[in-house]
Design a protein with these regions (language model features):
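Short helix-loop-beta connector
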Residues: 117-121, 143-149, 213-215
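Mid-domain Rossmann-like dinucleotide-binding core that forms the NAD(H)/NADP(H) cofactor-binding site
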Residues: 125-202
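Glycine-rich beta-strand-centered segment in the early N-terminal region that forms part
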Residues: 30-48, 56-100
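Short amphipathic alpha-helix with an adjacent loop that forms part of the alpha/beta core around
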Residues: 203-214
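Glycine-rich phosphate-binding loop and adjacent beta-alpha segment
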Residues: 226-300, 334
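C-terminal hydrophobic helical "lid"/dimerization subdomain
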Residues: 2-4, 278-334
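Short, well-ordered loop/turn sites that connect or cap secondary structure elements
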Residues: 87-88, 144, 235
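A structural motif shared across PLP-dependent enzymes of the aminotransferase-like
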Residues: 97-110, 283
């Protein structure tokens, strides 16, 4: 194995509130010779996702915190450069959780083979990857069925737009809220949402009353905060809440008070379920078959915001909290 020099992004300090570039550093490293039963991979694309913000904090959660001075982790799709394991050969395309770096060495068990058929290969980080699977699983968690009226917050994001498209394919009426008219048009014209509105124009609760005066059956929550409170008022009796994310509060220095109308859960007999996609990895093959089929048939669109180069990876991550992405935010590394 020839000498390989790689760059990686490390966490240098824990953010307080909104992360800043000084919390991160770009470090150049030289990879060690490739051991037996290991694989050398060059990353082509890496993912940046809002959930990563939680891993930058100390404290116990469903996934360990990032360590100070160590490279960050996250979804990536790459190409095998060299292999000393029988499971892979040079040229194979794989996904992994070793993002935030240009090259890495890993055991075969930590790599997931994928086909070159999907283009661009960053699809495996978006609609055909964990964000797409999160949307798909969310509809299972929410027991979404034909005829349901489904409201999705953060609807133009990576998970939200796929959730809306899948709900439409299931025969639902779909409403989405987002943060600009550009994104409203994207939801209506490209994703097929029945209704989309800009939450910045006026109170979400009031806009929902106008757009869906008879209420909603399902709320797919990517935001929390005002959107959750509005949904609790708009939900019909026996409505369901899919608790997927809460990006409105990820950078809060102090916890914010919860919705003032939680009592609606009792009076309306609502169901609220949390969602962590890794709990559903035994269904990944089923997801790939169904959603991959939709994509190949032209029934599912994939939208990306692409940032070029590892030097701009932190910028891409911070942009998630400023609404800079339409669809999935990815960083092209090679």
């Amino acid at each position: 194995m020839a000498k390989i020099v790689s760059r990686e992004i490390r966490l240098t300090s824990r953010p307080i509130g909104m992360p800043i570039t000084a919390n991160f550093s770009v470090v150049q490293t030289e990879l060690k010779p490739l051991p037996d039963q290991q694989v050398l991979v060059r990353n082509l694309f890496m993912s940046v996702d809002p959930y990563m913000r939680g891993r930058m904090n100390e404290g116990k959660s469903y996934v360990p915190s990032f360590k100070i001075g160590q490279p960050l982790e996250g979804g990536a799709v790459g190409e095998v450069v060299e292999s000393r394991a029988k499971e892979f050969k040079p040229g194979d395309v794989v996904t992994s959780n070793f993002g935030w770096r240009e090259y890495f060495i890993a055991a075969p068990k930590d790599l997931h083979p994928v086909s070159r058929e999907a283009q661009p290969l960053s699809l495996y980080l978006g609609a055909l990857g964990m964000t797409g699977m999160t949307a798909w699983v969310g509809l299972l968690v929410g027991e979404v069925k034909a005829g349901d009226v489904v409201y999705i917050s953060g609807a133009a994001g990576a998970v939200g737009n796929v959730a809306g498209q899948l709900a439409k394919l299931r025969g639902c009426r779909v409403i989405g809220s987002t943060g600009s008219m550009e994104k409203v048009n994207f939801l209506r014209e490209e994703c097929g949402f029945d209704i989309a509105f800009d939450y910045k124009v006026g109170p979400v609760a009031e806009q929902l009353k106008v757009e869906v005066p008879d209420g909603i059956d399902v709320y797919f929550d990517n935001v929390g905060g005002e959107a959750l409170e509005a949904a609790l008022s708009a939900l019909r009796v026996h409505g369901r809440i899919i608790a997927c994310g809460g990006i409105s509060a990820y950078n809060d220095e102090k916890p914010q008070p919860g919705p003032s109308n939680l009592f609606n859960i009792i009076t309306k007999r609502l169901t609220m379920k949390g969602l962590i996609v890794r709990d559903w990895l035994d269904r990944q093959g089923e997801f790939e078959k169904e959603v991959g089929g939709y994509f190949r048939a032209g029934k599912l669109k994939n939208k990306e915001t692409v940032v070029i180069g590892i030097d701009h990876a932190v910028e891409a991550f911070l942009g998630l909290f400023q609404g800079n992405n339409v669809g999935k935010m990815v960083v092209k590394l090679a």
